[in-house]
Swiss-Prot record:
<feature type="active site" description="Proton acceptor">
    <location>
        <position position="18"/>
    </location>
</feature>
<dbReference type="Pfam" id="PF00201">
    <property type="entry name" value="UDPGT"/>
</dbReference>
<keyword id="KW-0328">Glycosyltransferase</keyword>
<dbReference type="GO" id="GO:0035251">
    <property type="term" value="F:UDP-glucosyltransferase activity"/>
</dbReference>
<comment type="similarity">
    <text>Belongs to the UDP-glycosyltransferase family.</text>
</comment>
<feature type="binding site">
    <location>
        <position position="327"/>
    </location>
    <ligand>
        <name>UDP-alpha-D-glucose</name>
    </ligand>
</feature>
<feature type="binding site">
    <location>
        <position position="133"/>
    </location>
    <ligand>
        <name>UDP-alpha-D-glucose</name>
    </ligand>
</feature>
<feature type="binding site">
    <location>
        <position position="367"/>
    </location>
    <ligand>
        <name>UDP-alpha-D-glucose</name>
    </ligand>
</feature>
<feature type="binding site">
    <location>
        <position position="347"/>
    </location>
    <ligand>
        <name>UDP-alpha-D-glucose</name>
    </ligand>
</feature>
<dbReference type="InterPro" id="IPR035595">
    <property type="entry name" value="UDP_glycos_trans_CS"/>
</dbReference>
<feature type="binding site">
    <location>
        <position position="350"/>
    </location>
    <ligand>
        <name>UDP-alpha-D-glucose</name>
    </ligand>
</feature>
<feature type="binding site">
    <location>
        <position position="18"/>
    </location>
    <ligand>
        <name>an anthocyanidin</name>
    </ligand>
</feature>
<feature type="binding site">
    <location>
        <position position="342"/>
    </location>
    <ligand>
        <name>UDP-alpha-D-glucose</name>
    </ligand>
</feature>
<dbReference type="InterPro" id="IPR002213">
    <property type="entry name" value="UDP_glucos_trans"/>
</dbReference>
<keyword id="KW-0808">Transferase</keyword>
<dbReference type="GO" id="GO:0033836">
    <property type="term" value="F:flavonol 7-O-beta-glucosyltransferase activity"/>
</dbReference>
<feature type="active site" description="Charge relay">
    <location>
        <position position="111"/>
    </location>
</feature>
């Protein structure tokens, strides 16, 4: 077996939005001469489509729910406790298994939601780095909440003027979110003991917030974790995420349809892999977009919330409703005029990296803060105003926001700004760019001496 510069074990939290960015980082490490092993829970491993040609090794671990995964757990706290118990044992087994090989594990890169992985790394004498899948701004807000025992006072010094509606929802948790709130705060219990703190962002995008975070921990921004062939093109084999939890059948239909649409004419609507909208909100969206050409991704689990008979009324020549779409291919298609998004960090980074203006409709977690930055800091979109009491975005507000981005007074400026962020994303990943320098610094510290 070929001797590598080192061997990184990557341990993501078991959901698609966390698995994908760490896997992409593994590809960067592999391109620098590192062996990388990516762990997946048994349940996730059995439900995804893996690219067999990928250079990234896979190892399975247990979360205690091998047959049913997260949804079969009795509660969030129960799942997290069992994941810690079973996960730490099975990760330790993988480390031991490689100890006597030519490429023993030298570093663990673990999801920041799993601080127990750092304790494990220290037990084995390995280097370790938490991987934060949210922006520097959100991480800094969460850190402030942690050191202030879960509370925040507005305004927050050194950050843009924030209102309550701009904060991550877990910072102002309701009863149902308390377990997630605790998980967010626990990211910071031992992160100061890690060798590095990795953040899926890039220097120019999060410049000020990165500086704030660097005062409390050794931050390295290593994003965007978008496949290389869409940006810097240094890794020729990296043209997709190469694993997916969803059906891939509709990809060709989607891209063929887009190729026939005029440039900048289509509104792309997608709310990620987890967001659950109410029937009322779905009806408002359906009504708001009726005068536009659109591609709307409605997951199978959400389809029943569409207005009765809606799918039969869709003009197939002008619009398309699908259960899944190849998002990178869609966003990079010239037909797309704007991206109506829930503002999950991965989707936000894809929109920025591919230069697409956005209509922001945040739902929960870090999304409200991402929406704030989309509109007021990066100036690449408009946040749809929601009703204060119900939280519903009404059709008039949705339609107005789409028009603002597609053809409004500031439309040209938003498109130019989106192009600027795309150029800076490419620059950061290219040789000598900020992300490339940071990844080189990381590998120089963890390689076998």
């Amino acid at each position: 077996m070929e001797k590598m510069r080192g061997h990184v074990l990557a341990v993501p939290f078991p959901s698609q939005g966390h698995i994908t960015p760490i896997r992409q980082f593994c590809k960067r490490l592999h391109s620098k001469g590192f062996k990388t092993t990516h762990t997946l829970t048994t349940f996730i491993f059995n439900t995804i489509h893996l690219d067999p040609s990928s250079p990234i090794s896979i190892a399975t671990i247990s979360d205690g729910y091998d047959q049913g995964g997260f949804s079969s757990a009795g509660s969030v706290p129960e799942y997290l406790q069992n994941f810690k118990t079973f996960g730490s044992k099975t990760v330790a087994d993988i480390i031991r298994k490689h100890q006597s090989t030519d490429n023993p594990i030298t570093c663990i890169v673990y999801d920041s939601f799993m601080p127990w992985a750092l304790d494990l790394a220290m037990d084995f004498g390995l280097a370790a780095a938490p991987f934060f899948t949210q922006s520097c701004a959100v991480n800094y807000i969460n850190y402030l909440s942690y050191i202030n025992n879960g509370s925040l006072t507005l305004p927050i010094k050194d950050l843009p003027l924030l209102e309550l509606q701009d904060l991550p929802t877990f910072v102002t948790p309701t009863g149902s979110h308390l377990a997630y709130f605790e998980m967010v705060l626990q990211q910071f219990t031992n992160f100061d003991k890690a060798d590095f703190v990795l953040v899926n962002s890039f220097h120019d995008l999060d410049l000020h917030e990165e500086e704030l975070l660097s005062k409390v921990c050794p931050v390295l921004t290593i994003g965007p974790t978008v496949p290389s062939m869409y940006l810097d093109q240094q890794i020729k084999s990296d043209n997709d995420y190469d694993l997916n939890l969803f059906d891939l059948k509709e990809a060709a239909l989607c891209t063929d349809w887009l190729d026939k649409r005029p440039e900048g004419s289509v509104v792309y609507i997608a709310f990620g892999s987890m967001a659950k909208l109410s029937s009322e909100q779905m009806e408002e969206i359906a009504s708001a977009i009726s005068n536009f050409s659109y591609l709307w991704v409605v997951r199978a689990s959400e389809e029943s919330k569409l207005p009765p008979g809606f799918l039969e009324t869709v003009d197939k020549d002008k619009s398309l409703v699908l259960k899944w779409s190849p998002q990178l291919q869609v966003l990079s298609n010239k037909a797309i005029g704007c991206f109506m998004t829930h503002c999950g960090w991965n989707s936000t980074m894809e929109g920025l990296s591919l230069g697409v203006p956005m209509v922001a409709m945040p739902q929960w977690t870090d999304q409200p803060m991402n929406a704030k930055y989309i509109q007021d800091v990066w100036k690449v979109g408009v946040r749809v105003k929601a009703e204060k009491e119900s939280g519903i975005c009404k059709r008039e507000e949705i339609e107005f926001s789409i028009k603002e981005v597609m053809e409004g007074e500031k439309s040209k400026e938003m498109k130019e700004n989106a192009g600027k962020w795309r150029d800076l994303a490419v620059k950061s990943l290219s040789e000598g760019g900020s992300t490339d320098i940071n990844i080189n610094e990381f590998v120089s510290k963890i390689q076998i001496k």
